[in-house]
């Protein structure tokens, strides 16, 4: 009973904040509780059908699981509160294993299900592949976390998270404005659009912030277990901060190997770092003082209703990716209500209505207040940073 009260309270809070113009889950394919709550999926034209695509299995599985859970939580709340424009919402999530080809297969599966809107994909490479399909089909797409520039290349596509260039630029600005360091070493994944895109914009902005990049060392996804060379060069360069625009799995290895080398600079990452405290066998003390740019923290006061509801539903703390997805669902709801769409409309007509409405809404969400979107699909919201202290995230000023 407690979970239901918290869930409905959060739904009411989020519903009031919307303004238009003024358990862990199973791996693999998921037809979620958002559908089960209706007793039946519903015939086409009677319910809105939102699809999701992302990794549930594989190295990036934590991200996809978080997005699936955050989406389900929001949709269940919306359905309990009466749906969107009086219609219930069905949700179907497909596992892409962080693979572009499998993401296309997942997209085709969702098309066969008669998906009308896509909240996905979760990671950049699959998102770049899928956005070409949604653009050709004129199907509305909102990615919660696809941060590569090309992830929203069509006029039908938007994102909740910051783009890679925005993250790199904002990271350099934050480090410079808060005088965290002057000499920067970068360790990045040159095989990842996410990592290399952030690095590129960071390097471009660094001189404007009085920062000197003294080392820039690459690795690839095929060689991501031994970082001795990269760490030695960073240490020899005299860097007082190491910027890690990478995912948390590699970051956890880097922190351990840096400690083994008695190398203790300030470490700073981006949203892909979220999840490092959940790595199996990782000594959380090695992350003490780690900073990362992220618009969401489980310890932030304004997030507590969501965090409680998420813990009650899934038994774990939400990652930022869950918050991105949750905000994405409520953004779709706000745009759908602004556009007054109904599920009996064609997918193309729904897309045309939503892509106009997305530029006219403003929402207060978990990842930002007064969030709004440009016609290019980019979110407008203020960046935040957190620091890990005593095994927990703390918001920084």
Q: What residue spans do the PLM features occupy?
A:
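Hydrophobic alpha-helical segments within soluble ligand-binding/sensing domains
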Residues: 103, 160-183, 196-198, 224-228, ...
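Segments of small-molecule ligand-sensing domains
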Residues: 313-322, 333-393
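Extracellular/periplasmic bilobed ligand-binding domains
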Residues: 200-293
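Extracellular/periplasmic periplasmic-binding protein-like sensory domains
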Residues: 255-326, 387, 393-395
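An alpha-beta-alpha
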Residues: 157-218, 241
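Extracytoplasmic "Venus flytrap"
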Residues: 42-44, 48-72, 94-100, 122-123, ...
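Beta-alpha junction/loop-to-helix N-cap segments that form part of ligand/metal-binding clefts
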Residues: 27, 62-69, 81-151, 219-222, ...
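Short, low-complexity disordered leader/linker segments with a strong preference
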Residues: 1-49, 80, 397
